[in-house]
From Swiss-Prot:
ANK repeat residue intervals: 45-74, 78-107, 110-144, 148-177, 181-210, 214-243
Official protein name in the record: Ankyrin repeat, SAM and basic leucine zipper domain-containing protein 1
Organism classification: Eukaryota, Metazoa, Chordata, Craniata, Vertebrata
Gene Ontology cellular component list: pi-body
Modified residues (Phosphoserine): 17-18, 20
Residue segments, region Disordered: 1-25
Residue ranges constituting the SAM domain according to the UniProt record: 272-334
Membrane-spanning parts: none
Gene of this entry: ASZ1
UniProt subcellular location: Cytoplasm
InterPro entries: Ankyrin_rpt, Ankyrin_rpt-contain_sf, Asz1_SAM, SAM, SAM/pointed_sf
Keywords in alphabetical order: ANK repeat, Cytoplasm, Developmental protein, Differentiation, Meiosis, Phosphoprotein, Repeat, RNA-mediated gene silencing, Spermatogenesis
GO biological process, one term: spermatogenesis
Function: Plays a central role during spermatogenesis by repressing transposable elements and preventing their mobilization, which is essential for the germline integrity. Acts via the piRNA metabolic process, which mediates the repression of transposable elements during meiosis by forming complexes composed of piRNAs and Piwi proteins and governs the methylation and subsequent repression of transposons. Its association with pi-bodies suggests a participation in the primary piRNAs metabolic process.
Any Pfam family matching the protein: Ank
Length: 475
């Protein structure tokens, strides 16, 4: 009964099904007698027992049958070897036994390598990682592709195996290789929504600008598949090519990747990467991961970092090269700074009409910039809290600031209305003054139109901030 449930397990890795559901691996009851097998069973019967022992993972029987003369590289129906089958089910113990007996780790069938089979196996990452490590230790090539031009790292990235991806790169796997559709490992990770894989690949030097054959970048693939957090991360990342592990030697990289603590070994759990905070994501995105510990030691937050002056950068040990990267990132993220030019705090009575009109035009223009900035924020702000990439403080803080903004805009609207009424009063008095020479109608109409537009713009800005306030309150 249990044996029958296992029928059909060996399926070719990488999503490429074999021509048979069981690939020649028949499952049945194993008659384990105490007699020695060597020389007592016909070769065909030994092969059948060998296949059945492989299927149920009976390591001791496999060893016994190998001792009886079965070839470790014998091929069964459809060309599968014992090692390929063991890799397909992520049986690390069987893989080790077969490799120790001389199995060929570089064997391939129809462009399907054993390493690809292991990377696309169905099993725990712990077992898959052990199998991959064993195969790589026997010189399996991590850059040999299947018929679809997919390499082992692409399969590992697609299936979400972060440790396997890092191990393959440590053994020379090319990060930016593209398959027949132009997908890289990063594209596959973005498509499947594996955030930790995306972060690890960027750290290892993956190029987020490489496009698929239909012209899509990894960020666009993530967005198309509704992985908005990854889309934000890839759009935010400015300089992914400075992978911090790229300059290490192979041995140092392997040591760095595979260092485990006693608890991890005890529980057989490989590291799950902790969620990045806003500071870590920002530094990672611009290639300054090495500054993380320094800034944390000095209790420097992302907000503090982005508002530092040049002397503060130097005081905190931030080099000029790193300063340039931070300032470049800040320039990209920053809303255009509002400049009111040389407007004085008090307008002199001798101010000309042209100068006063210029003041109103500047004020109106800056209000327009503010409206556009708020509209952009509303458009880009995620409607779901789960889609926020960076860590946020309490929403109450944002709501309180929005309330202050609404109050300020209301005050501004009130003052502009007073200004409009005052100007209208002056205009009426001048029109009723018999000594006043009437100006051309076009000028008066133009001035009135400007004032109306200014008032409408300010009122519209106030309404927009009121809507923004309601939006934050709902969240």
């Amino acid at each position: 009964m249990a044996a029958g449930a296992l029928r059909g397990l060996p399926v070719a890795g990488g999503g490429e099904s074999s021509e048979s559901e069981d690939d020649g691996w028949e499952i049945g009851y194993l008659d384990r007698t105490s007699q020695k097998l060597k020389g007592l069973l016909p070769i065909e019967e030994k092969k059948e027992k060998f296949k059945k022992a492989m299927t149920i993972g009976d390591v001791s029987l496999v060893q016994e049958l190998l001792d009886s003369g079965i070839s470790v590289d014998s091929t069964f129906q459809y060309g599968w070897t014992p090692l390929m089958y063991a890799a397909s089910v992520a049986n690390a113990e069987l893989v080790r036994v077969l490799l120790d007996r001389g199995a060929n780790a570089s064997f391939e069938k129809d462009k399907q390598t054993i390493l690809i089979t292991a990377c696309s196996a169905h099993g725990s990452e712990e077992q898959i990682l052990k199998c991959v490590e064993l195969l790589l230790s026997r010189n399996a090539d991590p850059n040999v592709a299947c018929r679809r031009l997919m390499t082992p790292i692409m399969y590992a990235a697609r299936d979400g195996h972060t440790q396997v991806v890092a191990l393959l790169v440590a053994h020379g796997a090319e990060v930016n290789t593209q398959d027949e559709n132009g997908y890289t490992a990063l594209t596959w990770a973005a498509r499947q929504g594996h955030k930790n894989i995306v972060l690890k690949l960027l750290e290892l030097g993956a190029n987020k600008m490489l496009q698929t054959k239909d012209g899509k970048m990894p960020s666009e693939i993530a967005k198309r598949n509704k992985h908005h957090e990854i889309f934000n991360l890839l759009s935010f990342t400015l300089n992914p090519l400075e992978g911090k592990l790229q300059q290490l030697t192979k041995e140092d990289t392997i040591c760095k990747i595979l260092t485990t603590d006693s608890d991890r070994e005890k529980d057989h759990i490989f590291s799950s990467y902790t969620a990045f905070g806003d500071l870590e994501v920002f530094l990672h995105g611009i290639g300054l991961e090495h500054m993380t510990d320094l800034l944390k030691e000095r209790d420097i937050t992302l907000r503090h970092l982005l508002t530092m002056r040049e002397d503060e950068f130097t005081k905190n040990g931030i080099t000029s090269k790193d300063q340039q990267k931070i300032l470049a990132a800040l320039k990209e993220l920053q809303v255009e700074e509002i400049q009111f030019g040389e407007l004085s705090e008090e307008i002199k009575l001798e101010i000309s009409g042209d100068e006063f009109l210029n003041f109103l035009l500047k004020l109106n223009k800056q209000c327009g910039h503010l409206i556009t900035a708020v509209q952009n924020i509303i458009t880009e702000l995620p409607v779901n809290s789960q889609k926020i990439t960076l860590e946020w403080a309490s929403p109450r803080n944002f709501t309180s600031v929005c309330e202050e903004l609404v109050n300020n805009v209301e005050d501004l609207s009130e003052e502009v209305c007073k200004l409009k009424d005052l100007i209208q009063k002056l205009q009426n008095e001048r029109e009723n003054d018999p000594t006043h020479i009437q100006l051309r109608e076009e000028v008066s109409t133009w001035n009135s139109r400007i004032l109306k537009r200014t008032a409408i713009t300010v009122c519209g800005f106030g309404f927009l901030l009121f809507i923004c306030k309601l939006t934050f309150q709902r969240k």
